[in-house]
Amino acid sequence: MTDDDRIKLEPSWKAALRGEFDQPYMHQLREFLRGEYAAGKEIYPPGPLIFNALNSTPLDQVKVVILGQDPYHGPGQAHGLCFSVQPGVATPPSLVNIYKELQRDLNIPIASHGYLQSWAEQGVLLLNTTMTVERANAASHAKKGWEFFTDRVIQVVSEQCPNVVFLLWGAHAQSKQKLIDGTKHLVLKSVHPSPLSAYRGFLGCGHFSRTNSFLEQRGMAPINWALPPL
């Protein structure tokens, strides 16, 4: 049995990523994570939710990709979808600004929670390029191997899916543009929605309406960005 036979992953992704789990970088990443757990470190998101982005949005259903950097590092926040937090947790500042732009762009009322699962289930792949983090230690798992894996995820979407909208917010996300075939897909870029930068162009970018226009022009259902109440 190979390592990728033991990973609990949605079937379409498992087929597309078969072989990644036997790559040397993945063995090194797995050893790093084992060591962190063995040392008693608290790692987010919880193990069953590490691949939640892929498990919530099958490859053949991807319409939109939003890239984040690494998971939230506070207790109870991260659940494997970038920018999203678990129910009952305060909405983080960057997500508040995303909601402000949704309100300005599409007149969608600001949600009372930060749980973006309904976006994922409509085909919005909410992918952090680093998929784990140590509690209270931002970027602690950067450059440990996750980036090789998530770069491959981005490439697979670009290669195998038609007419995807990639939302690249901030320099880190925009560094992944080289992995995307811009002749097949729509790439929209802006500064990050963080309070440090949102007022320099994220607020006013119109990415959500532009995404839906692109999808509708190609005969695809638009994303309902309004979140259901919890």
From Swiss-Prot:
CDD domains tied to this protein: UDG-F1-like (cd10027)
Gene Ontology cellular-component terms listed: cytoplasm
Active site: 70
Stored SUPFAM superfamilies: Uracil-DNA glycosylase-like
Keyword line: Cytoplasm, DNA damage, DNA repair, Hydrolase
Catalytic class of the enzyme: hydrolase
InterPro entries, A to Z: UDG_fam1, Ura-DNA_Glyclase_AS, Uracil-DNA_glycosylase-like, Uracil-DNA_glycosylase-like_sf
Catalysed reactions listed for this entry: Hydrolyzes single-stranded DNA or mismatched double-stranded DNA and polynucleotides, releasing free uracil
Disulphide bridges: none
GO biological process assignments: base-excision repair, AP site formation via deaminated base removal
MF term (GO), any: uracil DNA N-glycosylase activity
Intracellular or extracellular location(s): Cytoplasm
EC number annotated for this UniProt entry: 3.2.2.27
PROSITE patterns, per database record: U_DNA_GLYCOSYLASE (PS00130)
Pfam families named among the record's database cross-references: UDG (PF03167)
Origin superkingdom: Bacteria
Family: Belongs to the uracil-DNA glycosylase (UDG) superfamily. UNG family.
Its biological purpose: Excises uracil residues from the DNA which can arise as a result of misincorporation of dUMP residues by DNA polymerase or due to deamination of cytosine.
Protein name (Swiss-Prot/TrEMBL): Uracil-DNA glycosylase
Name of the gene this protein is made from: ung
